């Protein structure tokens, strides 16, 4: 997978999170999630290894991003984005 595709997926996630309220069922605020994603984007842009474990946790089913996306009406978009991240993690 091209790293640009992962970066685009993470940036799209940030765009949605910036418009979202933190989920009451999540143990992490939208702002905290954004900070973690920005770190991973920076690593990817600088040809450094991304933290696969962090991405797995953030994008896991019933994880913090999915909970936030459902609570804010972009759950279907999350599934599409998560598929890109899963492709990266699996590859």
Report the location of each language-model feature.
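Alpha-helix boundary/N-cap detector
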Residues: 1-8, 28, 32-35, 53-56, ...
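Amphipathic alpha-helical interaction modules
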Residues: 16-63
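Short terminal alpha-helical segments
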Residues: 1-30, 82-89
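Amphipathic alpha-helical binding modules
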Residues: 56-91
């Amino acid at each position: 997978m091209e790293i640009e595709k992962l970066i685009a997926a993470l940036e799209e996630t940030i765009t949605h999170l910036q418009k979202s309220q933190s989920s009451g069922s999540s143990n992490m605020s939208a702002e905290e999630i954004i900070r973690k994603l920005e770190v991973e984007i920076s690593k990817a842009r600088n040809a450094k290894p991304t933290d696969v474990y962090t991405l797995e946790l953030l994008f896991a089913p019933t994880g913090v991003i999915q909970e936030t996306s459902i609570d804010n009406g972009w759950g279907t978009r999350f599934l599409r984005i998560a598929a890109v991240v899963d492709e990266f993690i699996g590859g």
